[in-house]
C-alpha cells in the first residue's frame, strides 16, 4: 500500500478579481465578471519523490440573472523530480440562462499507479505499481427538458491508456488481466440530472441527482466492449443557521468486458476518503456517506464525515462482512463569501489506511 511520507502542504494562495464586472443594480450579476483563485503545493511520497504543483479555479457568470449558476474551470497539475507529471482541467459552463450545461474533463499524465487485483478482498502485494501514460477526454452536454432544474443530454468518453512499464507487478505480468497492456476505451451514452441546490459550491438546501449510461464499443473505436451505469444522489439539509448536513449515495455498475483500469474504483478525495483511489475495484461499487459542515470563526469552517462502501463482481456477491468504513474530518477556508467558495483540507481514515486531501470545493 502506498505510504504518504510527507503531507501535501499549502505555501501560499492568491486570489484575484482582476476582471471586475461593470457596476450594476443590486438584483443582477453582470455578464463577464471573472474571479480566480490559485494555490501552489508540494508533497513527497516514495513513488513520486518530491512533487511540485499548482491548482486553482476560474469562475464567472454568463447570465445576467441574480440566481444564475456560475460557470467555472478548475485545474490542477504537478511535476516530480523523477519526471512524472499529471494535468487535469475540468470546465463546467452554464449557458442560456442555465438552460444548457457543458461539462468536460481533460487529463494527461505519465505517473506510477497501483494495482492490487480485483475484488473486495484483494490482498496487499509487494510489487503493486506500474507506470502508465494516460489521456482522458470526457464531454457531457445537457439541456433543460420537461421542467426547470431537469436536464438531459449525450455523453462521450474517450481514454487512451498505455502501460509503459509493469514494474514487476505479478498480476499485470501474467497477462491474464484484461487491459494489462493498456488500450483505448471509447463510449457514447446519455445523462439525466435534477439539480435543486441553492448554491453549486456550498449547497445548504436542495439536492443533486444524476444518472448516466455509457456504452463502449469497438464500433466507436474502443478496444473493449462494455457498459457503465452510474447513479449519484446528494441531499443537503440546513439544520441550523450555517450548519449543513449533506449525504450522498453513489452506485456504479458495469457489464461486459471493461479493462482493469476502467473498473469501478473505490477511494479517492470525494467518495470513501481514506482509501487509495483504486485500492479496491470491481464491476460494482456502492457507497453512502454523510458530512456535517459548520462554521468556526471568521472564514474558517469545520466538517466531520463518515461513510460505508465496497465493491463486488455482481449483486449476489455483495458481502456485509467486507463493507469498508470511511471517516474523518476537515477544515474549510472561505475564499469567496458571495459565491460561498471554499478551500478544503480533509483527513480521511479507512480500514488500516488513511489519506490527506487538498482541493477547492466540497467533496460532494
Which residues does each predicted region cover?
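Bacterial Sec-dependent N-terminal signal peptides
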Residues: 1-23
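Gram-negative/organellar outer-membrane beta-barrel architecture
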Residues: 27-38, 43-184, 266, 281, ...
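C-terminal hydrophobic structural anchor segments
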Residues: 293-326
